[in-house]
């Protein structure tokens, strides 16, 4: 890449970043937090944060990358995607009606709410315990990270249930919403994330999600400022780099350490070059249509229920890894959201996918506002827990693609909804058995005397 080509890419990158960052800043000033703000920051991180890292790798370490015209296509496709997404998100198809009384779909009381978070926590802890009994601490047993996906590890499906510890702790926080509950959320979820990191053998997702939710709650409540958020972001990047070194068993120093930091940070937070690789091999891609979305559900079907279930699931990530990169190491490499759309239907699917994503984020914001307006604090805690708990799925959406997001959000919805139903059933059983007693609040003495 010549300096002239780099200068052109830099101008496009600066304009695109400024465009998205400006819209995000105005939205932040208006509402302080909603899921449009979160997705916009996540989109910036995924598709634009990596460009400076790539530039340093190219000019400092002479690392080979896709041709400049392909990198330009990747930057422009990301900017155009966000433009279509933003217009879709802001467009109202019907007039907004405020304060119209509607019959609630469901309601919650104190006992049902506490039962719900206990059930969610139980699902996570029992899954971790069973996985540990089968495999022990994989971080200290395995020699490479790819072995996690080998036949040496049993009960891999249980990992999908670990995450429900976070929405359980979110319910606990939203019932109190004070600084002590906020700090308790951080300590409990990060401790659980470190435990699963050691047991699973290097999975950092639970730690990243817990820390991100903690920061956004702090921003919403005004407990942390923007400069504190930036400092925490730098700390998070360094922390993720250290965990990655431990995961891959790397011992580096000097220039090698700087090089390793650059490419691991890029691959962890901003795999934008994967989109460029897909565009570079565009003519070799056999468009998969909507099949990757259907195939991604296969992993949730147990083999005893479907004996002939394919052992290899050809979703967009695996198609990119196996067919485009010809990589059969056992790891699935993230194609990114736009990359998954390219795999499914080429360039035509990019604006269509942007419209779908805009509607998805709009729905989450509607649910979040519903929780903000809800007078029943127990129901509000459940709604907010569901919305913030789905942050993991939004990260999957940006990094892994639309197919992975759809299967995971449906799975999350089913497990969360089942926990609610079980909590309501248990409450009905306890109430029928006479085990539920209403709390009686005694009036202060002076107030009682005034009524006599």
Swiss-Prot record:
Membrane topology label: Multi-pass membrane protein
Pfam families per record: WzyE
Q: Which HAMAP family match?
A: WzyE
Family from the record: Belongs to the WzyE family.
A cellular-component GO term for this protein: plasma membrane
Gene from which this protein is expressed: wzyE
Alphabetically ordered keywords of this record: Cell inner membrane, Cell membrane, Membrane, Transmembrane, Transmembrane helix
- Where primarily located? membrane
Q: Where in the cell is it found?
A: Cell inner membrane
User: What's the protein here called?
Assistant: Probable ECA polymerase
Pathway linked to the protein: Bacterial outer membrane biogenesis; enterobacterial common antigen biosynthesis
């Amino acid at each position: 890449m010549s300096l002239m080509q780099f200068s052109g890419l830099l101008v496009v990158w600066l304009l695109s970043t400024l465009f998205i960052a400006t819209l995000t800043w105005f939205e932040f000033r208006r509402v302080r937090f909603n899921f449009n703000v979160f997705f916009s920051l996540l989109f910036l991180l995924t598709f634009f944060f990596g460009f400076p890292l790539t530039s340093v790798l190219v000019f400092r370490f002479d690392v080979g990358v896709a041709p400049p015209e392909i990198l330009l296509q990747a930057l422009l496709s990301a900017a155009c995607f966000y433009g279509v997404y933003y217009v879709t998100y802001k467009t109202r198809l019907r007039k907004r009606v405020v304060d119209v009384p509607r019959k609630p779909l469901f309601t919650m009381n104190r006992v049902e709410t506490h039962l719900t978070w206990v059930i969610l926590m139980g699902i996570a802890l029992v899954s971790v315990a069973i996985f540990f009994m089968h495999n022990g601490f994989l971080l200290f047993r395995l020699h490479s990270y790819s072995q996690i996906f080998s036949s040496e590890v049993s009960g891999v499906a249980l990992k999908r249930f670990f995450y429900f510890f976070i929405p359980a702790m979110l319910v606990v926080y939203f019932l109190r919403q004070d600084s002590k509950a906020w700090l308790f959320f951080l300590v409990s979820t990060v401790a659980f994330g470190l435990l699963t990191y050691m047991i699973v053998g290097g999975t950092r997702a639970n730690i990243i999600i817990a820390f991100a939710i903690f920061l956004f709650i702090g921003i919403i409540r005004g407990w942390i400022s923007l400069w504190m958020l930036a400092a925490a972001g730098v700390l998070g990047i360094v922390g993720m780099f250290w965990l990655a070194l431990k995961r891959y068993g790397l011992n580096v120093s000097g220039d090698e350490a700087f090089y390793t930091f650059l490419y691991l940070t890029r691959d962890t937070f901003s795999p934008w070059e994967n989109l460029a690789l897909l565009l570079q091999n565009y003519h070799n891609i056999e468009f998969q249509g909507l099949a990757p979305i259907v195939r991604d559900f296969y992993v949730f079907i147990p083999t005893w229920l479907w004996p002939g279930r394919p052992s290899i699931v050809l979703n967009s990530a695996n198609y990119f890894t196996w067919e485009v990169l010809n990589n059969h190491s056992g790891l699935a490499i993230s194609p990114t959201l736009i990359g998954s759309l390219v795999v499914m239907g080429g360039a035509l699917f990019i604006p269509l996918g942007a419209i779908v994503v805009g509607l998805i984020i709009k729905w989450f914001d509607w649910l979040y506002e519903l929780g903000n307006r809800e007078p029943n604090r127990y129901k509000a805690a459940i709604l907010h827990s569901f919305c913030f708990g789905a942050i993991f799925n939004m990260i999957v959406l940006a990094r892994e693609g639309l197919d992975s997001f759809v299967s995971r959000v449906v799975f999350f919805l089913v497990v969360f909804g089942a926990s609610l139903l079980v909590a309501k059933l248990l409450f009905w059983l306890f109430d029928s058995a006479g085990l539920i007693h209403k709390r009686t609040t005694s009036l202060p003495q002076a107030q009682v005397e005034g009524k006599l």
